[in-house]
From Swiss-Prot:
Family label: Belongs to the polyribonucleotide nucleotidyltransferase family.
Annotated Gene Ontology cellular component terms: cytosol
Cofactor(s) this protein cannot do without: Mg(2+)
Subcellular location: Cytoplasm
Name of the protein this chain belongs to: Polyribonucleotide nucleotidyltransferase
The species this protein was found in: Anaplasma phagocytophilum (strain HZ)
Keyword Metal-binding applies: yes
Gene3D superfamilies, A to Z: GHMP Kinase, N-terminal domain, K Homology domain, type 1, Nucleic acid-binding proteins
Biological process annotations from GO: mRNA catabolic process; RNA processing
Length: 838
């Protein structure tokens, strides 16, 4: 049933397997490539274009489903959505590697889909996907020049050792992350990030990748010979020489005059006029109805014009030794730089190079603003974000704005790679950094203008970069043995040239390199020359930038979020957070600060102003502090009981305000004066390991100040007064029977409605009085309560006299019986007054 073709080879320290004939047999070409546990299904389908076009309608899509790593997608729908940035970047790598290998003039629709089936962190998926796409094209029968292979390259600087297809762990210590693609004869594509490597080290990486890709190209060729069911279709482009030769010398002169315009807007206007005129002439000449009809179609006219125009301009550059706009090969366009031009931005820069302009703006945020990336290679948090925007008005077009496309994502990532190696560590600069590049004008090299503008804006923000970073786009025009390497290319030079070579870096070395080749036969000697010329241009641009701002500002601006850290006991983390995050939310709402708590007890506080940070610190300090007797705290009533109210304070602390400590007057029920959720001020009056006793009546609830709170005079109800004073803080005598006297810290007699009560404080009271129908009995130095009657009064001893060492006067005696008379009163010696409050 299956006609399977399989090829296996050892590549590096892993096994590479290419297989076809089992899966996706309806596709024009389909292969499964496995390398070290990473597997990709690559398919290719081609069909005739529905309408005549003058370009190659090639689409490349790399898809990474979560099943490749044994996961279920997050979110409500549990299904993959739009491609991630990582998938988009891998799709671009494949596209840029295979697009130059289709024959010129080929306009059939081609769709390449690479589906990640399995992922292992030891093997990069882009390597496997490109090999799969190349093999699928090789067996599809679609016109395709030759196989292509790619590899990821790492570099251990201290050892001077290059790594083939490094694992994720190896990349974490590598000074280089490069993807290199080639054919059997030439370099095709390079994408890399480096930690300030020299030109020689980068060239060595290119040569290393070139050598190791060669064996895979041979394997793909052998596999295609075995698996191919039919020979590749031969594409014969239309012979356009007749059309090209018919273009007169007057049009040649008009094109050269138009291209000599230095300003892009004027140049484009003149070129459009010449092209429109020539197109009309050629249509009349070659597409008019005649006997037998024309052998040409409209797109042939377009191809012929492009070929003529490209050949004319390239020859002029090589012959005259000057550029389209009159510059020398290594000359940089005029540069204008301005920083700090947007008042409310955290940092800004306007970088203008010729007719290319980037307005770059920065914003700093807290670690809570970090981007959470949920990818097939694991979840991570990204603290540096760089977004590149290319609106239509940048090139004078009137069209609708659309979400960022592949080009914008790719250019933004290139600029990100250029800046990332010079950023400070999170420990040195814990902010989340976002850079936005708005391309306001474009005439080539807008991604490198973004690099320069981003470096300037970050320094203007106060981000301590290691050094300035500049970028430059290089071009190449090659005809036979003649070639010209162009610095700081225009958009037209990019379109008409053979190479787009972008280099970014510092004075110390290269941080990013991107290269796309359109022709074969570029050797490493030419690349070495291009790297050296790019270095000179990079230094020239950095010098211009340093004249405006050479070092990062000493401090961030006032309206940038401030941040401070404090360390709390790990056991107190729950107190700061509170039930369901209540406490930390309240702190954020009241102060306007943002708070982040780590498991080790580190608390990061972020706020725009110093006052907000200090307020948040004070609130956190209050929560984690141990309560102290005699101190006042803010709290909230959390529970009501018959005997009092429970109040939470200092975060999760809970204490009891006894009913007698709520107010200075009698209350019938706690619910009459308090409700759950009330904000109150409390004084800690006593505490032990498990219980905290609080008082409200001793605090002015409006001001939060402690007040001079004396015991109030109790009212006598159906009873008989029992002397002048009771306890050390009383003024009037305590009552018996139904008299209500607060009990607690103040000692003395304390009676309920049935006449119960007697107490002491710190051993000061020598006896405890009791009320009852019978006579009293002695209770020396104890804190016992005796039986209570309805209204009679009994003294401590039969003599009817009572003494208290801590009172101003002592109570007397009462007769036996329900309506006994007052006993005699004997005043005791006055005792020194103790402090009433903490």
């Amino acid at each position: 049933m299956f006609d399977i073709t399989r090829k296996c080879v050892e590549w590096g320290d892993r096994s590479l397997t290419i297989e076809s004939g089992k899966i996706a047999r309806q596709a024009g070409g389909a292969v499964v490539v496995d390398y070290g546990g990473t597997s990709v299904l690559a398919t290719v389908v081609s069909q005739k274009s529905k309408e005549a076009v003058d370009f190659l309608p090639l689409t490349v899509q790399f898809l990474a489903k979560s099943y490749a790593v044994g996961k279920i997608p997050g979110g409500f729908f549990k299904r993959e959505g739009k491609p991630s940035d990582r998938e988009t970047l891998i799709s671009r790598i494949i596209d840029r590697s295979i697009r130059p290998l289709f024959p010129s003039g080929f306009s059939d629709e081609v769709a390449v889909v690479c589906n990640l089936l399995s992922y292992d962190a030891s093997s990069p998926p882009e390597t496997v996907a490109l090999i799969g796409a190349s093999a699928a094209l090789a067996i599809s029968g679609i016109p395709f020049h030759c196989p292509v292979a790619g590899a990821r390259i790492g570099y251990i600087r201290g050892e001077g050792r290059y790594i083939l297809n490094p694992s994720a762990d190896e990349l974490s210590v590598s000074a280089l992350d490069m993807f290199y693609a080639r054919t059997d004869t030439s370099i095709l594509m390079v994408e890399s990030e480096a930690h300030e490597l020299t030109e020689a080290e980068m060239l060595g990486a290119l040569q290393f990748g070139h050598e190791h890709c060669e064996e895979i190209i041979k394997v793909i060729g052998e596999f295609a010979e075995e698996a191919r069911k039919c020979a590749p279709a031969e594409f014969v482009p239309c012979d356009l020489s007749t059309i090209i030769d018919s273009i007169g010398s007057d049009y040649k002169e008009r094109f050269l005059v138009a291209y000599s315009e230095k300003e892009k807007k004027a140049r484009v206007a003149k070129l459009d006029a010449v092209r429109a005129s020539l197109t009309e002439d050629l249509r009349v000449k070659f597409l008019s109805e005649s006997e037998g009809g024309s052998k040409y179609i409209a797109q042939d006219i377009v191809y012929a014009m492009k070929t003529f125009e490209r050949s004319l301009v390239r020859e002029r550059v090589l012959e005259s030794k000057s550029r389209i706009d009159g510059r020398a090969y290594d000359q940089i366009r005029n540069i204008e730089i301005e920083v700090d031009l947007i008042s409310k931005a955290h940092g800004s820069a306007l970088f203008t190079r010729g007719d290319t302009q980037a307005l770059v703006i920065t914003a700093l945020g807290t670690p809570q603003d970090e981007q959470i990336v949920d990818g097939f290679d694991g979840d991570k948090r990204e603290r540096f974000l760089l977004h590149y925007n290319f609106p239509p008005y940048a090139v004078g077009e009137a069209s609708a704005l659309r979400p960022p496309g592949r080009r914008e994502i790719g250019h933004g990532k290139l600029a990100w790679r250029a800046i990332h190696p010079v950023l400070p560590s999170k420990a040195d600069f814990p902010y989340t950094i976002r850079v936005v590049s708005e391309i306001t004008e474009s005439d080539g090299s807008s991604s490198m203008a973004t690099v320069c503008g981003a470096s300037l804006a970050l320094m203007d923000t106060g981000v301590p970069l290691k050094s300035s970073v500049a970028g430059i786009a290089m071009g190449l025009i090659k005809e036979g043995d003649r070639y010209a390497i162009l610095s700081d290319i225009l958009g037209d030079e990019d379109y008409l040239g053979d190479m787009d070579f972008k280099v970014a870096g510092t004075r110390e070395g290269i941080t990013a390199l991107q290269m796309d080749m359109k022709v074969k036969g570029i050797d490493f000697a030419v690349l070495g020359t291009a790297l050296d010329q790019a270095k000179e241009g990079r230094f020239f641009i950095i010098e211009k930038m340093d004249r405006v701002i050479k070092e990062s500002r000493g401090a961030v601006r006032e309206h940038v979020p401030r941040m401070e850290s404090m360390l709390i006991d790990k056991g107190k983390i729950k107190n700061v957070i509170g039930a369901g995050g209540k406490n930390v939310r309240e702190i954020c709402e009241k102060t306007g600060a943002k708070i982040e708590i780590s498991q080790d007890g580190t608390v990061m506080i972020y706020a725009v102003g110093r006052e907000a940070i200090e307020s948040a610190k004070d609130m956190i300090t209050g929560i984690v502090s141990e309560p102290e007797v005699g101190k006042i705290y803010s709290g909230e009533v959390c529970e009501l009981a018959k005997y009092g109210a429970f109040v939470t304070f200092l975060g999760a602390r809970k204490g009891l305000v006894h009913i007698s400590e709520i107010r200075n007057e009698h209350i019938n029920a706690v619910a009459d004066v308090l409700a759950v959720g009330d904000k109150v001020k409390v004084l800690v009056i006593d505490m032990d390991k498990d219980h905290i006793q609080l008082s409200m009546r001793r605090i002015d609830q409006e001001t939060g100040d402690q007040v001079d709170c004396e015991l109030y005079a109790p009212q006598r109800r159906n009873g008989v007064a029992a002397g002048n004073t009771v306890g050390d803080s009383s003024v009037n005598g305590g009552g018996a029977g139904s008299v209500y006297v607060p009990r607690g810290d103040y000692g003395g007699a304390s009676a309920g409605r049935n006449g119960r009560g007697g107490g002491k404080r710190d051993g000061a009271a020598k006896s405890s009085s009791s009320a009852g129908n019978g006579g009293g009995r002695s209770s020396s130095s104890t804190r016992r309560r005796h039986s209570a009657g309805s209204s009679g009064y009994s003294s401590d001893s039969s003599s009817g006299n009572t003494k208290s060492s801590s009172s101003e006067s002592s109570g007397g005696t009462g007769g036996r019986g329900r309506n006994g008379a007052n006993g005699d009163v004997q005043n005791g010696p006055a005792a020194p007054k103790k402090p009433r409050f903490f």
